[in-house]
Amino acid sequence: LGNNIPEICEAIGSDVAYDKTTFSAYETEAVYEAMDKERKNVLICGIEAHICVLQTAIDLKAAGYQPVIVADCVSSRKELDKELGLKRAEQEGILITSKEAILFELTRKAGGPVFKQISALIK
């Protein structure tokens, strides 16, 4: 439903794009096949929090994954729609966090090169 942002493709070292005509990314065959069935936690960032992000999270939860929506990495055209999408996700038992919280949760400890890189990113 849109193009990839060049800066994101550069940062992750890939410009892989999947055709997506469904609102839920999990209903896209290429995304479904690319999912690592051994990993159960899925971080979700994207646009239209009240539609695409929400439906993807609900589908992932139904499939046995633990979706985690990164609230400051999602948006909607209207702020109210974003707020309602996040509220609905929370009502569905989906975890909501911030980019800073999840980055430090994944880092696990202070000190070292990874901590320094993450700290520099969020300042």
Show the residue positions of the predicted features.
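Active-site-adjacent betaalpha module
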Residues: 1-123
